[in-house]
Structures are given as C-alpha cells and as structure tokens.
Amino acid sequence: EAADPSTLFYNPAGLTKLEGTQATINLNIVAPNVKYKDGKAYYPDGSEITRAPDGSANVERDGKITDDVVIAPHGYISHQVNDKVWLGFGMYVPFGSGTEYDENSVLRYNLNELSLRTIALQPTVAYKVNEQHSVALGVVAQNSKAKLRQYANFRAFAVANGMAVANGMADGYAKVHGDDWGFGYNLAWMWDINERARVGVNYRSKVEHNLSGDAEWHLVGPGFANPALAPRIRGAGYAEKEDASVKITTPESLSLHGMYKIDPKWNVYGDVTW
C-alpha cells in the first residue's frame, strides 16, 4: 500500500507516495517450538546409535531442535527532497536460521548446530517519473554471522590405524564460526493504473558471503584415552584450531504485487514472489 517508510523493503518505488519526512520502527518476535520424538539413527556399519559422545548410554531420543526466541528489528526512514525525488534508508533482518540438537542427541551426526544471523542496511533513491509511474534503486549492504557445529564418528579412522574402538566411543565435533559483509541491489517499479488499481515489481539481488573465521576440532570420546589416537587424527588434518571460511549466498527474489480499492473502506492485495 506504500502507507509508511517500510515500503522500502516491499517496493521502494512506493516512497514517492509519502510526504515530508517519516520514520517507522517494527519489532518481530519469532518463537519456534520444534520437537522430535523416538529418534533413530545409525552408524556407518548399519548398527543403531546407542551411545552419547561420552560413551555412556545416556543418548537422547526425544528433544527439541530449537527453542530460542529471536527478536528481529526493522527500522525505516523516508525524506521527500522535492516533487520528483525521495530518499530512504532501511535497517532490517532479511534472513535468519537457527537449529540446535542436544549434544547427546541420537541425531547429533546431522548438522548439530546452525546459527545464521543477517542484518541489512539499504540506502535508496526513488524517482517519480510522472503521475502514474515511479522507480527506485537501492544498494544493500548485508552483514552475516554464522556458527556451525558438526559431530563426527572417528571409529573407522581408529580401526584403519589398528586401534580397537567400539562405535560411539571416538566422537569428535567441529565448531566453525565466521562473519562477512556482502553487497547487492534492489530495483523497483510502481504503476498507478488508475485511482483504484496499482501494480508493482520488486527485484532483490542475491548477496554472496565468504564468511571467514575459525574452525576448532574437539575430540571428546573415551576412546581418545588411547594416547596414540588423537595425535594421528590431528596429523590427518583435524587441527585443534585453524582458519576457516564458509560460503553462503542469500537468494535473489522477484515480486509482482497489486492493490485494488473496492470502496473507501476495503482494499484487496495480492503478491506473487519467486
């Protein structure tokens, strides 16, 4: 509808509908509650996972994937320079992800923890071509931070090196974290067909990140009581700490949306996004 500066996110060409200087602040609260029950998983030899990383039978088959409450702030400001030009600035959270299994979970050999946080800053200029058409261009500066944890079963490595270790007794895990700035752009067009109907197109480019940081391998299973096992694993490239990078690309999107005013009290809206 282009009723306030948050139109900068949905279709920044709508800034030309705003008078003077305006600002808006929004706060989204996401409280997921995802659970699993009677989980089963298997070692590479086909036997069922029955041990926790410490080698005990305290393996969890029920649990939560995540229960973190996430607060996502959004803030926008617009300023009308003259009858043709508008400026806008937005700070928003375009993408995020959070998954974490308990470290004793039977599902720990999946990606055990994933945390992705992004925040975008977008300066924008909008131009009113005529009474029916407006266009806009925005530059997106996006900061991303990621944290990953992945468990691994080193039993096969131990056996290949002549050490007798039972399944679940030689667990280790990797922790990787990094951050990066990436850049993209936003293009938009809005067409007032008549006083009652309006359509718009909004394109948001992909943003590529090469998150750089640290990777750490932790060897936690009781099988590492064998003094020969850990040095051989370290020597095979599983360093205690080293530089690491993670490539993440946030997707592009193309939206077509419209509004139709039925009467002074009722509007109908539609949106299709690829």
Features from the language model and the residues they span:
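Outer-membrane beta-barrel porins/channels
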Residues: A3, G20, Y43-R61, V69-W274
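Acidic, small-polar-rich N-terminal luminal/periplasmic segments of exported/outer-membrane proteins
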Residues: D4-S6, P12
